[in-house]
């Protein structure tokens, strides 16, 4: 297809074109681009394509700042100026709430953009692999590398291939320096990188966590099958400790399984502490190697402030915090509430929530672990009291119908619904509409250069 004009943005960071009533989804283009398209997949009502030639570039186009753009699979909206990114995210929220929710809405507040659009993440995970991914350009030029080992990110659709990352713009540059130093040391001393198909090799993954307190955690994960490999591994860790004295938590994990999950594995301290801290309004949140914490610390604070403001707390309320995670929101609003009860599926997260309450001398929170639809029942409410306010922050799939039914039974005065998926949020708002009216909507951009958007909605009992 020749000289097709890109019309709009779509889900998953792609853009839309239309040819003879056929809707076409195209990645890495922006509205206003005029391109030739090559169809990759065709369905009855839509097709997926890629741009193979640009005839005109949109005036609303930015130059990508990352050398890995278009290959690593992340930051797909680098080609859009940030002002355009947040405009489309605002539109995404409005479209979802109106098209799917079909409910009466107030005026939607302007999106809260991120002050940082680069180096805004506090956590990144990198993968080692003995199969370096070669870009199309490298293949065309028949580039030969002395090293086919790589450390970086998985290529979308090719789990055993890893794109060698020289510089990632998502996390503080210390992350790049540590990763590249480990890579170079491993090259120089002939360490083996994992083969993701056969599971042979030593170095597997590394995780870097930074924090607003200036603390720095590095976790190196390896496979050890022979005794001498442990000695080699500790030599690598000593090199990291000597080279980067600013690391406050240098940890390691032995993973001899066939998958990369670490939740069921022991974490060992090589140097420093087994945790770092995040801070927010004088509260300290302990973050361990397996802990969940919002990956954009500064915007997380803004998000939580919106949730607290919408909750309208005076100090007398019983608050339920559903899908509480490690209890960050629950502990954050506890000073303005009579009591906060947090419920979360993951037992380890609930233990973190209790620890964080103890660290901050918070005595008016209770935390329970269990599946939400099994925990939040009429009996639970009869036992613990009817909530005045419910704050809910469910996963992308939204809330289970049973959970919504119990919320309707409980009839809190206000519901604050925090969502990372405005589409499922809109569906749930429609289900709550029989008793609740939407009073305020506040989108928040947590992830610049991606299509993801958070949205906070205040509902009040009719």
Predicted segments with their positions:
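Terminal RNA-binding accessory module
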Residues: 1-68, 366-367, 374
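Extended interfacial segments that mediate partner engagement and assembly in macromolecular machines
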Residues: 53-63, 73-192, 226
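Short, aliphatic-rich beta-strand segments
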Residues: 208, 214-223, 284-288
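A short, glycine/Asx- and small/polar-enriched loop/turn
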Residues: 118-122, 212-214, 451-452
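Short, acidic/hydrophobic/Gly-rich beta-strand patch recurrent on exposed beta strands
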Residues: 15-20, 152-155, 219-221, 353
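Rossmann-like S-adenosyl-L-methionine
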Residues: 3, 11-13, 227-462
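Short, solvent-exposed loop/turn elements at beta->coil junctions and helix N-caps
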Residues: 109-116, 196, 203-205, 443-446
């Amino acid at each position: 297809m020749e000289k097709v004009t890109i019309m709009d943005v779509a889900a998953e960071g792609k853009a839309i074109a239309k040819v003879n009533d056929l809707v076409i989804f195209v990645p890495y283009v922006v509205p206003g681009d005029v391109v030739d398209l090559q169809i990759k997949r065709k369905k009855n009502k839509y097709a997926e394509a890629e741009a193979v030639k640009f005839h005109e570039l949109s005036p609303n186009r930015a130059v990508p700042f990352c050398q890995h753009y278009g290959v690593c699979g992340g930051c797909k909206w680098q080609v859009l100026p940030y002002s355009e990114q947040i405009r489309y995210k605002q539109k995404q929220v409005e479209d979802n709430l109106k098209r799917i929710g079909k409910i009466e809405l107030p005026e939607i507040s302007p999106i809260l953009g991120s002050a940082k659009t680069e180096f805004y993440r506090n956590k990144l995970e990198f993968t080692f692999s003995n199969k370096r991914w070669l870009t199309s350009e490298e293949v065309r030029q028949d580039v030969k590398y002395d090293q086919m080992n790589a450390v970086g990110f998985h290529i979308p659709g090719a789990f055993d291939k890893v794109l060698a990352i020289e510089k990632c713009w998502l996390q503080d540059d210390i992350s790049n320096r540590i990763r590249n130093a480990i890579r170079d040391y491993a090259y120089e001393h002939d360490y083996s990188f994992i083969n993701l198909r056969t599971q042979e090799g030593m170095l597997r993954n590394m995780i870097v966590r930074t924090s607003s307190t200036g603390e720095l955690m590095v976790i190196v994960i390896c496979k050890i099958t022979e005794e001498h490999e442990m000695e080699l591994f500790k030599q690598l860790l000593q090199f990291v400790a000597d080279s980067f004295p600013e690391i406050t938590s240098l940890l390691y994990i032995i993973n001899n399984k066939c998958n990369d999950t670490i939740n069921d594995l022991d974490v060992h301290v090589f140097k420093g502490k087994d945790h770092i801290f995040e801070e927010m309004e004088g509260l300290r949140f302990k973050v361990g190697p397996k802990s969940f914490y919002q990956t954009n610390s500064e915007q997380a604070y803004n998000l939580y402030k919106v949730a607290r403001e919408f909750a309208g707390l005076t100090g007398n309320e019983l608050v339920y915090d559903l899908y509480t995670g490690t209890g960050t929101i629950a502990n954050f609003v506890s000073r303005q509430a009579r009591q906060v009860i947090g419920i979360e599926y993951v037992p380890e997260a609930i233990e973190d929530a209790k620890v964080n309450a103890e660290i901050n001398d918070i005595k008016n929170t209770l935390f329970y672990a269990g599946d939400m639809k099994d925990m939040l029942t009429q009996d639970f409410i009869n036992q613990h009291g009817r909530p005045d306010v419910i704050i809910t922050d469910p996963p992308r799939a939204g809330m289970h119908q049973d959970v919504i039914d119990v919320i309707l039974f409980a009839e809190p005065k206000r519901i604050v619904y925090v969502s990372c998926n405005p589409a499922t949020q809109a569906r749930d708002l429609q289900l709550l509409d029989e008793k609740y009216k939407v009073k305020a909507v506040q989108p928040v951009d947590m992830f610049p250069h991606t299509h993801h958007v958070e949205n906070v909605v205040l509902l009040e009992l009719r």
